[in-house]
Amino acid sequence: MTTVRSLTTRLQRVPLTRPWAADVTSVGIIATHVVRSDGAEGWGFSWSPQIGAPAVHALLEHDIAPASVGRSAVPGECWQGLWEHLHEAGGGGVTTIALAGLDLALWDAEARSAGTSVSHVLGRRRERVRGYGSGVNLHYSLEELLAQVQRWIDAGFEGVKIKVGKPDLAEDLDRVAAVRALLGPDRALMIDANQRWDLDRATASVDALSRFSLAWIEEPLRADDLAGHAELARRIDVPIALGENLHTVHRFGDFLRAGAAQVVQPNIVRVGGITPFLRIVELAAEHGAALHPHLLPELSGQLALTLPDTAHEVLVEDVEDAGFGALGALADPSPVTIGDGWLTENAHEGLGIRFAPLLTGGRTPADDPLTARKDHS
């Protein structure tokens, strides 16, 4: 049996070109490097934009790394056992985000050892997937927001997503009306409240905004409010989208069974990696829900190319100037390209996501085990 020989990690922050808020000017990355007993190597990562990256790093270093040594290195085989081992620290959140660092690296190693990509290992079903323009823009002036939307139109996106949740509903109405006028009637418009409303405010807001032909309302309520989302779904006609802040397969099952979400958006890192993501894909199909992976297009886009065909077109979110490639964070060329509104995959092995170190003290990428390939034979 091929087993895990070692897991090493590195914590770093990647500066954002467009800050998401005054206090969100960078995102936390924990780069991971796994070596298997047969010498094969894989690279992965965990990710937490604002809060908790050092905690994720500590869990990887002090608990996951030693507990993974000697376990099966076949992707998916050690995930459940490690999750049960870590469960005392919580079933989801920091634990699943940290588990993704190992899970992604194991999938990367599996594909690299076969000289191919992860999408090929999983079974690519399409050559391209449609993207949509997205941004953290509630703090933008109306003029800045419309300029951003125009950039998305010029980039060929057939759908865009903007933030809502201003203190005054009238301002949300003005902003959404202006964006719809700029988009015209044929492009899709999604809105995201980022958990800013309670049930009654969400009901009133969606009723008022629905005149603008919305594709979905995202995270209208506190993310873990199952009963609230189920009730809101009964009150409104606009599909509810959520999932970026659900951390386990079990929680996705709860929301789907309750009819609390018509669109699910698992973040592949937050749910624990590719292994649990694949189960969430199955759950969404069982319940007839659309599934669009959340953020991280270099990763989400590759997985989107492998998703089974359903009644819903798969979409990939492209937050303006926030992809790892656009931020200059990758040691290698980006594994995906987004152009004319579509995401396609570039030739690469594994996931093709290795992070360039923040160089200090004269170090070079060749000195770093997380970016330099080694011969372990």
Regions found by a protein language model. Give the residues of each.
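Conserved, mostly hydrophobic/aromatic
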Residues: 4, 39, 64, 102, ...
